[in-house]
């Protein structure tokens, strides 16, 4: 198990490709172990779910609007025709304040469409400090490949 002990091959592939598709064991543990190794190498890390992400690029890097649940209440002339809109800070905004590289681990990445996965790859190319790891399902052992290679298959 030297792969899980050092994580150097994973980090080397992540830095070379920017966006990786990962298949991790379903019992868990591999993702937190690798994130701990990345933090030890100087990365700022964040783990989040891909469910409910919406437009990934806007959600992760730009200030954007959301509509809170109405909970059955009627708005009386306070909001727009579509309802109240609240502005939300980007998910990765605080991680980009330092000069450290940023690693984002997205759980349940199999719910994302092909175009959303390609936009994540493009985002890694435009923002050189950002590295994205997308968990694309389970496997008996930890496997990863570049996202572009995964999408071609």
From Swiss-Prot:
Asked if the Swiss-Prot or TrEMBL record annotates the protein with the keyword Disulfide bond, the reply is no
**Matching Pfam families:** NdhN
Taking the first listed entry, what is the main subcellular location of this protein, grouped into a coarse class?
membrane
Stated membrane topology is: Peripheral membrane protein
Give the molecular function GO annotations: oxidoreductase activity, acting on NAD(P)H, quinone or similar compound as acceptor; quinone binding
Which cellular components does GO assign to this protein?
plasma membrane-derived thylakoid membrane
Q: Is NADP tagged as a keyword?
A: yes
Membrane-crossing ranges are none
Can you state which reaction this protein catalyses?
Answer: a plastoquinone + NADH + (n+1) H(+)(in) = a plastoquinol + NAD(+) + n H(+)(out); a plastoquinone + NADPH + (n+1) H(+)(in) = a plastoquinol + NADP(+) + n H(+)(out)
Q: What class of enzyme is it?
A: translocase
The superkingdom listed in its UniProt entry is Bacteria
Swiss-Prot/TrEMBL keywords: Membrane, NAD, NADP, Plastoquinone, Quinone, Thylakoid, Translocase, Transport
Places the protein is found: Cellular thylakoid membrane
* Matching InterPro entries: NAD(P)H-quinone_OxRdtase_su_N
Please state the Enzyme Commission number of this protein. Answer: 7.1.1.-
Tell me the function of this protein. Answer: NDH-1 shuttles electrons from an unknown electron donor, via FMN and iron-sulfur (Fe-S) centers, to quinones in the respiratory and/or the photosynthetic chain. The immediate electron acceptor for the enzyme in this species is believed to be plastoquinone. Couples the redox reaction to proton translocation, and thus conserves the redox energy in a proton gradient. Cyanobacterial NDH-1 also plays a role in inorganic carbon-concentration.
Describe the family membership recorded for this protein in Swiss-Prot or TrEMBL. Belongs to the complex I NdhN subunit family.
Q: How does it assemble?
A: NDH-1 can be composed of about 15 different subunits; different subcomplexes with different compositions have been identified which probably have different functions.
PANTHER family in the record: NAD(P)H-QUINONE OXIDOREDUCTASE SUBUNIT N, CHLOROPLASTIC
What is the name of this protein?
NAD(P)H-quinone oxidoreductase subunit N
Q: Which organism is it from?
A: Synechococcus sp. (strain CC9605)
Instruction: List the lineage, top down.
Output: Bacteria, Bacillati, Cyanobacteriota, Cyanophyceae, Synechococcales
């Amino acid at each position: 198990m030297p792969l899980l002990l050092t994580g150097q091959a994973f980090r080397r592939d992540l830095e070379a490709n920017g966006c990786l598709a990962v298949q991790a064991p379903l019992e868990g543990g591999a993702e937190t172990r690798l994130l701990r190794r990345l933090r030890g190498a100087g990365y700022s890390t964040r783990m989040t779910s891909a469910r409910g992400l919406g437009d990934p690029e806007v959600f992760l890097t730009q200030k954007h609007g959301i509509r809170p649940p109405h909970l059955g209440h009627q708005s009386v002339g306070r909001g727009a025709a579509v309802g109240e809109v609240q502005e939300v800070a980007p998910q990765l905004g605080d991680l980009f304040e330092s000069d450290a590289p940023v690693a984002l681990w997205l759980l349940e990445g199999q719910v994302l469409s092909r175009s959303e996965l390609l936009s994540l790859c493009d985002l890694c190319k435009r923002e050189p400090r950002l590295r994205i790891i997308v968990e694309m399902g389970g496997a008996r052992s930890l496997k990863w490949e570049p996202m572009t290679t995964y999408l071609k298959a």
